[in-house]
């Protein structure tokens, strides 16, 4: 569906072509003076050497209003703005179209869209998820929904980092906590995980095995048993917490199985930019000038570094999309992994793929604040605040909404006091209340399929203009990965609806059916956008 904005931009481009001018066009939505406005003439005055007001008049005279009947009026305003008004029929048609499309409003064509693998969260299976993982999950899950809405086939993947020393630490931690069931003085290793989650895991081990492994020697066989058990119960708890958070995955891929299935070495052997030095195998990551030094991928003793499995895994993800031309893989990592970005991109390119087919988004840290003070420690775990504790404190929707309210590359403070409020100071409350009010209005009216025919009221037009921006929002987010644009859009839409509701008589008005159609369309778009964040959608509040 061609939007009104696209029609206006097309009319301006045609006018510029007549005047033999080339210039990008930006439209805004003014609070007054029309439905759309552009400062195009102001940006051209230096280039053309004449006043903006004169340029604006020339552009307006070149616009073919007979061709673009959706535009009912164009005016020039000082010092050189061009303002557009669109016909009432365009707005009514849009509202009726939204009500016809329902959940599919904003869907973009799948034609020409590549498949996308998004790997996110991917926390080590060594304990409960914490607040940093929560931000990763909120960003990743929302981006997956947005890209699907934009027409992409999306694969959600969790990489289980279950290979390496952190798993040995997990095994030793659970083993020690298990022994402490029988002997409270049993020592914990210095590098053990000391959170309460290890006690929970040890209790689960005791429930399954009883005292069978009491006072046993910590042999390789015993270590493997505790490592495997710890991995499984940690992953089980991770999945439980993600489920509560409204996050799910198509694939859980084990790092250990990358080696067991011999997926690593065939890929490593294909790297073009490796060399031998000091008995080790190095990857020439400085080759492109983006890394500060070359990296060892195989140590002198033949042991692989963590890079080997990661290099192979990234190619595996891409190949399994079965879309070598348009496919793309996206990783969402914490900002503390920034030094690893170029190494992975270089190795991906070194294997023969295009660099633009891998994207790595780095999200910044967050703090949880209550009563103006940072919550640094968990009351139960003695570690970072866990996702399950955060969900218990404020609920899924508040966490999902406020963790994507800011750009992923911005640090944020998650204010417990703010998100717990049920009043107009809480944007999530306002958004949900707007949806519930729409639902109640429609229930009371009992008109199943209202048809819009007259939306000349200023408040109705402003609200309709917000609705028509939704497809553009989907397109922008899909291209930029800026899912933080969703919350302010929802808040702006809710605000436009509340202004409409407060200033327009609906029941008994001659335009009642048109207004109810607009209410229905607003309800659809509010719900549609909230679903992208996996928020619960209330009909009553």
UniProtKB/Swiss-Prot annotation:
Q: Does the keyword Aminoacyl-tRNA synthetase apply?
A: yes
Q: Please give the InterPro entries that the UniProt record associates with this protein.
A: aa-tRNA-synth_I_CS, Arg-tRNA-ligase, Arg-tRNA-synth_N, Arg-tRNA-synth_N_sf, ArgRS_core, DALR_anticod-bd, Rossmann-like_a/b/a_fold, tRNAsynth_Ia_anticodon-bd
Give the EC number(s) under which this enzyme is classified: 6.1.1.19
Location comes to: Cytoplasm
Q: Which UniProt keywords apply?
A: Aminoacyl-tRNA synthetase, ATP-binding, Cytoplasm, Ligase, Nucleotide-binding, Protein biosynthesis
Quaternary arrangement and interactors, per the entry? Monomer.
State if ATP-binding is listed as a keyword: yes
Q: Which GO terms describe its cellular component?
A: cytoplasm
Gene name of the encoded protein: argS
Gene3D superfamilies hit by this protein: Arginyl tRNA synthetase N-terminal domain, HUPs, Isoleucyl-tRNA Synthetase, Domain 1
UniProt motif 'HIGH' region: location = 123-133
- Give the highest taxon in the source lineage: Bacteria
Similarity comment: Belongs to the class-I aminoacyl-tRNA synthetase family.
Entries under PROSITE patterns matching the protein: AA_TRNA_LIGASE_I
What PANTHER family does its record include? ARGININE--TRNA LIGASE, CYTOPLASMIC, ARGINYL-TRNA SYNTHETASE
SMART domains linked to this entry: Arg_tRNA_synt_N, DALR_1
Which organism was this protein described from?
Metamycoplasma arthritidis (strain 158L3-1)
Pfam families per the UniProt record, alphabetical: Arg_tRNA_synt_N, DALR_1, tRNA-synt_1d
| Protein name (Swiss-Prot/TrEMBL) | Arginine--tRNA ligase
According to its UniProt entry, the protein's GO biological process terms are:
arginyl-tRNA aminoacylation
């Amino acid at each position: 569906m061609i939007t009104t904005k696209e029609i206006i931009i097309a009319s301006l481009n045609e006018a510029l072509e007549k005047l033999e001018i080339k210039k990008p066009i930006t439209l805004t939505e003014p609070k007054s003076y029309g439905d759309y406005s552009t400062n195009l003439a102001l940006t051209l005055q230096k280039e053309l050497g004449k006043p903006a007001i004169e340029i604006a008049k020339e552009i307006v005279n070149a616009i073919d209003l007979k061709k673009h009947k959706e535009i009912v009026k164009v005016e020039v305003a000082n010092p050189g703005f061009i303002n557009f008004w669109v016909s009432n029929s365009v707005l009514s048609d849009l509202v009726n179209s939204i009500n016809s499309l329902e959940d599919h409003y904003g869907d973009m064509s799948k034609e020409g869209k590549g498949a996308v693998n998004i790997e996110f969260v991917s926390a080590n299976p060594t304990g409960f998820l914490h607040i940093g993982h929560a931000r990763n999950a909120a960003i990743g899950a929302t981006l997956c929904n947005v890209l699907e809405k934009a027409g992409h086939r999306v694969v959600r993947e969790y990489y289980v980092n279950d290979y390496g020393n952190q798993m040995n630490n997990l095994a030793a931690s659970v083993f020690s906590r298990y022994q402490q069931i029988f002997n409270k003085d049993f020592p914990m290793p210095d590098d053990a995980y000391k959170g309460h989650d290890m006690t929970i895991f040890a209790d689960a081990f005791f429930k399954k095995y009883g005292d069978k492994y009491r006072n046993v020697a910590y042999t390789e066989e015993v270590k493997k048993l505790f490592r495997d058990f710890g991995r499984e119960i940690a992953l089980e708890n991770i999945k439980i917490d993600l489920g509560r958070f409204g996050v799910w995955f198509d694939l859980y891929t084990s790092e250990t199985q990358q080696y067991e299935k011999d997926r690593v070495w065939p890929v490593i052997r294909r790297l073009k930019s490796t060399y031998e030095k000091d008995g080790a195998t190095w990857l020439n990551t400085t080759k492109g000038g983006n890394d500060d030094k070359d990296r060892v991928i195989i140590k002198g003793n033949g042991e692989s570094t963590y890079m080997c499995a990661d290099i192979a895994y990234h190619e595996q993800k891409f190949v399994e999309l079965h879309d070598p031309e348009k496919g793309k893989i996206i990783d969402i990592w914490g900002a503390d992994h920034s030094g690893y970005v170029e190494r992975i991109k270089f190795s991906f390119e070194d294997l023969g793929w295009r660099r633009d087919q891998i994207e790595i988004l780095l999200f910044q840290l967050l703090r949880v604040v209550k009563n103006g003070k940072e919550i640094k420690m968990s009351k139960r775990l003695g570690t970072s605040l866990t996702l399950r504790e955060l969900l218990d404190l404020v609920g899924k929707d508040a966490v999902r909404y406020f963790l994507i309210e800011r750009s992923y590359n911005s640090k944020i403070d998650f204010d417990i006091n703010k998100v717990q409020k049920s009043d107009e100071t809480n944007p999530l409350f306002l958004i949900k209340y707007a949806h519930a009010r729409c639902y109640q209005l429609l229930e009371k009216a009992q008109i199943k399929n209202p048809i819009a025919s007259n939306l000349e009221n200023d408040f109705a037009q402003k609200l309709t203009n917000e609705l028509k921006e939704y497809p553009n929002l989907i397109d922008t987010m899909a291209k930029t990965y800026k899912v933080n644009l969703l919350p302010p859009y929802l808040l702006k839409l809710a605000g436009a609806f509340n202004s409409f509701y407060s200033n327009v008589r609906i029941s008994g008005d001659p335009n009642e059916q048109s207004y109810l159609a607009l209410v229905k369309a607003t309800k659809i778009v509010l719900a549609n956008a909230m679903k992208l964040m996996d928020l619960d959608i209330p009909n009553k509040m």
